[in-house]
Amino acid sequence: ATGKLYQTFWYNNGVKEDTAVMYYEDGMRVFRKTPFRRDTMHGVQIQYYKSGRIRAKLEFVDGLRKPYLEEFKSDGTPITDYASLVVETSDNYKQNGTYTIKLSLNKKDVKANFYRGGYQNGLFNPKAVAKINDSDYSGVILLRKTADPAQNYVEVIAEILTPLGNRLLEYRKIDLPYNDLK
């Protein structure tokens, strides 16, 4: 331990309330401010460069992420050149009753988590979706023909690692050519 201030929390009746502040290693400059309500992240988290300029903004509601993310270069310019989701499908329905969805990114060296499922009330809930990664860079959904009717679409979310270490969320609804796949 260096003896320098690292993080501050405000507590009310034993639970985190208000804004938690994390500092750079010098103990003076603010790295991140995270709002809390009843011990849970709630509101816009703001990250800062050592210069004091805003580095990133992410929003939470009751501990869950909203898709909102803004990141900025050290000169204040918005970052916009993120990797994005690429969807490839393979239709073998007539041959063996399968339909495969492969997820990857347009930038092959960027890591991501891929999930089957969508947002709940506009929020990303990792417990309500199924991780489908087959590597750090791709995910696969193998659907099979069933005797029962099923949804004619699949929802997916890519949780993309940004150059600043945050997670960009990208949602996609993929229409299926058949309504009996599970």
Language-model segments: residues:
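Glycine/tyrosine- and acidic-biased, solvent-exposed loop/turn segments at the edges of beta-strands
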Residues: 1-182
